[in-house]
Amino acid sequence: DQTGSGKGDWLMKKQIFALIFAVLPAFAMAQAALEYPNDPVVVDLKDKAALQDGAKTFANYCMGCHSAKFQRYERVATDLGIPTKLMMDNLVFTGAKIGEHMKIGMQPQDAKVWFGAAPPDLTLVARVRGTDWLYTYLRTFYEDPTRPWGVNNKAFPAVGMPNVLADLQGRQVIGCKQVQVVEGGKKQFDPLTGTPITHEDCHQLTVVPKTGKLTTEQFDEKVKNLVSFLAYSANPVKLESQRIGTYVLLYLAFFFVFAYLLKREYWKDVH
C-alpha cells in the first residue's frame, strides 16, 4: 500500500526532525561550555587549614542538596585533623553518627519534584570534572532573570541550580569592562608607551560592589578551599599513597645498589 508507506515515511521524517531540534540546544550548550576557558587553580592537599575551611563550606552551603555518600565523617575528621566533638557540633546537621557516610536528609523522589532532577553526589566530582572546571564553575554564576533560579553560568550554560554562594560573592552580572587586546595568543601593548592596548567588552562578569560578604580575592580563596576539599574527597588516600610511594622509591634505589654490586660479582669472571 503506497498510501500507508507514504504516511510511514512522513512520520519517520517528522520524528527525525523532532529529534534533531531537541538535540541541537544540548549541543549548543555543550559547545558554549567547552569554549569558556577554565581558570587554573593550584590545589595543595597538604594544607589542612584550607581543607578544613573547604569542609566547613561544603557542609554549610552544599550538603543541603548534595551528598558525599562515599565519604565518612570520621574519615574526614581524622584526615583533616578536626576533633570529633568539633566535627559533630559544627559539620554534622542530619543527626548522623561520626562513623556514618555523609548523606543528606532530602529524598531523591522529592528532589526530582522540586528541582526536576536529583542533585548529584559530589564525592567524586573533582575526578570527573577536574579542579580547574570546578573552580571556574563556582565563580561564574551570574544573574539571568530568564532562568528558573534567576541565574545562569558561564561554564555550565542553562544550569539548573541556584547560586548557593551568592551571599558570599555578591550579585554578579554581565557588564562592560576594559580588557586587554589579544592577537595570535599574545597580549598587545602600545609600542611607544608600553601600556596594554585595551577595548571595551560588554560580555564580562562583574560583581556589584558591596553586595557580598567577601571581597573578590577572599571569595576566590574560599572557592579554592572548597575545591581543595572536593579534590581530597575524590581521592582521600592520595597523600598516603604519595608518602608510601616515596619509601618505595627509596627502597628501590637502595636495592638497586646491592643488585648492581651482586651482578658485578657474578659477572666478574666472565669479563
Across the structure, where does each feature detected by a protein language model lie?
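Short, aromatic-rich amphipathic segments at membrane interfaces
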Residues: V208-G245
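Electrostatic cytochrome c docking/interface patches
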Residues: A32-K56, S67-T78, A234-Q242
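Short, Lys/Arg-enriched N-terminal segments with co-localized hydrophobic residues
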Residues: D1-L11, T193, H199
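Electron-transfer interface patches adjacent to heme c in soluble/periplasmic c-type cytochromes
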Residues: G81-L192, E200, Q204-F219
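The canonical Cys-X-X-Cys-His
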Residues: F58-K69, L226
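Sec/Tat signal peptide C-region and signal peptidase I cleavage site
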Residues: A26-A32
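Juxtamembrane interface at the cytosolic side of transmembrane helices
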Residues: S241-T246, L250-H271
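Bacterial N-terminal signal peptides
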Residues: A18-A26
